[in-house]
């Protein structure tokens, strides 16, 4: 009989928890989305969360539809926020050919624009936690993924609420903040703390 611990995370649990943890970096007060791209050897290739493009100030633009800061009134954040899936693809520093055959773990089902990029780079499996709220766009994404031969897997249950997902993310964020306040720091292998 083995003495190994029995209640460890499965690979799917591990990578989805990675996506949830990554989503905690998003400053969007309404939709925190995280993505994690993994190769067939269970190695994380890249991660991303929904946020502004690099170099843009989070305080300069509206995170709501008010248009107070930009003068644009309808779904203003949709014009400038980079989605988690796209950020994960853009953050990858190797050849995009390396993404062929990989798996994407994402906290929300991909929109149509992200779906196009997922297909284009050759990701072959999408594991999502929560369904995107716009049914028509979900249906279009599903059709595209199906036609491209991308396997789609719902991790858990389709009717998990946004609040339930964000509650887990908040718990993880709370733990990270608590560890930080206790003096825990991340150690850099290149020497020193960051």
Residue positions per predicted region:
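Zinc-dependent deaminase catalytic domain
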Residues: 1-194
């Amino acid at each position: 009989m083995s003495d190994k611990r029995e209640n460890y995370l499965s690979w799917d649990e591990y990578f989805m928890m990675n996506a949830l943890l990554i989503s905690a970096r998003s400053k969007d007060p309404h939709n925190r989305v995280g993505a994690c791209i993994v190769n067939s050897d269970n190695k994380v290739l890249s991660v991303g969360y929904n946020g502004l493009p690099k170099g843009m100030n989070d305080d300069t633009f509206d995170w709501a539809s008010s248009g107070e800061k930009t003068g644009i009134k309808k779904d203003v954040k949709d014009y400038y926020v980079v989605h988690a899936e796209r950020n994960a693809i853009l953050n990858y520093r190797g050849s995009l050919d390396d993404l062929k055959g990989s798996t994407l773990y994402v906290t929300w089902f991909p929109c149509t624009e992200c779906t196009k990029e997922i297909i284009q780079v050759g990701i072959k499996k999408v594991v999502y936690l929560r369904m995107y709220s716009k049914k028509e766009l979900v249906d279009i994404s599903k059709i595209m993924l199906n036609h491209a031969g991308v396997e789609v897997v719902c991790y858990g249950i389709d009717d998990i609420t946004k609040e339930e997902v964000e509650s887990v993310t908040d718990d993880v964020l709370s733990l990270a903040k608590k560890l930080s306040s206790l003096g825990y720091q991340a150690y850099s292998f290149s020497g020193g703390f960051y």
